[in-house]
Amino acid sequence: MVKAVLTDIEGTTTPISFVKDVLFPYSYEKIQEFVLKNKDNPQIVKILEDVKKIEERELSLEEIIQTLKKWIEEDRKITPLKELQGLIWEEGYKSGELKGYVYPDAYEKLKEWYEKGIKLYIYSSGSVKAQKLLFSNTNFGDLNYLFSGYFDTNIGNKKDPLSYTKIAQSVGLNPNEILFLSDNPDEILASA
């Protein structure tokens, strides 16, 4: 029996086009200004250091920014990039430049499951911060009340079966009690 639903966002609750055509270009356009403005913020300093570790070499601030832009172009699922994008999107949502979009049928089904007492969770390659931002500013208003928890790349890759085991342990359920929704067959196979 299904006791929880774990859903992806991009292509599942929200059009792929929203992420690819709205969020990614927004972060690409704003990343240089954001990093330069916040380069002394401890959270940003850590993200910049993480980029250097991943690249395994010393990089100037400009080289780090160019690396981050390249990762956006390549749609890389790398934690420091996702964390930085979440911070950039937060500014966009707060300023009103960004507003999330949820498919009407996805909203209706999530609401129905919530009302039936089925726990709802998000698992996305976007940071938890970005997930909460998207669902707090949607075409249906703030939907974060629907969700009992959020997972991102910190728990593991969505194509790694171990990630789903960790999520099940984290929410106190057996993996066979969790329905995973995604538009990606490789992720569905990993969750099985």
Predicted regions and their residues:
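Metal-dependent phosphoesterase signature
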Residues: 56-104
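Acidic, divalent-metal-coordinating active-site segment for phosphoryl/phosphodiester hydrolysis
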Residues: 183-192
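Conserved phosphoryl-transfer catalytic core
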Residues: 19-70
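Asp-based phosphoryl-transfer active-site loop
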Residues: 2-21
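Short, well-ordered beta-to-alpha junction loops that form the rim of enzyme active sites
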Residues: 9, 123-127, 183
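Conserved SAM-binding loop
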Residues: 120, 180-181
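Substrate-recognition "cap/lid" segment bordering the active-site pocket of phosphatases
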Residues: 127-178, 189
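Substrate-recognition element of Asp-dependent hydrolases with the DxDx(T/V) motif
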Residues: 86, 95-138
